[in-house]
Amino acid sequence: MKKLKILLSLLALAALTVFTIYHWVSYKAKHNLYENVTKIPKNKVGLLLGVNKFTYHGNVNLFYKYRLDAAVALFKAGKIEYILVSGDNSRENYDEPTNFKNDLIARGIPSDKIFLDFAGFRTLDSVIRAKEVFGQNEITVISQKFHNQRAIYIADHFNIKAIAFNAKPVKDRNVVILREYLARSKAFIDLIFNVQPKFLGEKITIQ
């Protein structure tokens, strides 16, 4: 019985820690989030965070669609000059950045205004590489609100001046939010231990 009480106490403490971190990240980011294109300040580069274009059932992923819509809206409103698409390209026939590039071009974004980061395996990699590889100390992150909050939190830790534009949310996202609780806790630990991207590499100039 004593061991059970200790186990339950540890589980309760872990749950409280995860809950606290989740809401701390939200609090830290709240003044840097925008949902109105007319109100968001201008930045040279918008960092479009990658996601799979299709769901497991073969339908277009709404997270993808709404991020694409958001990036196009910002560019056409003159709020960003370039779009840096950062995503995963680590598996055969899976290429988040190129999918976005093709669809951005189809929506009227000039190809020379789009840069691709194929080593954005996770949000931490994408944010740090935007600074260390692509030379951006100020960025506009483009994703859904919950994702933007974590990206802003990471950017702040690495002295990157970041704001974010919230893409349209997706309904029925309980599983995504549960994952976000864990992702924020992992990000918190990563920052404590100064975890760096899997790859850095040569500098790339956006111009």
Language model features by range: what are they?
Residues 1-8, 79, 204-207:
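Short, Lys/Arg-enriched, disordered terminal segments
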Residues 10-12, 74, 191-193:
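Enrichment for repetitive, rod-forming helical segments
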Residues 24-178:
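A structural signal for short, hydrophobic/glycine-enriched beta-strand patches
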Residues 177-196:
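A transmembrane-helix-recognition feature enriched in membrane-embedded lipid enzymes
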Residues 1-38:
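N-terminal type II signal-anchor transmembrane helix
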Residues 195-207:
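Short linear elements at protein peripheries
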Residues 1-5, 174, 178-181:
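Structural motif marking the loop-to-transmembrane transition
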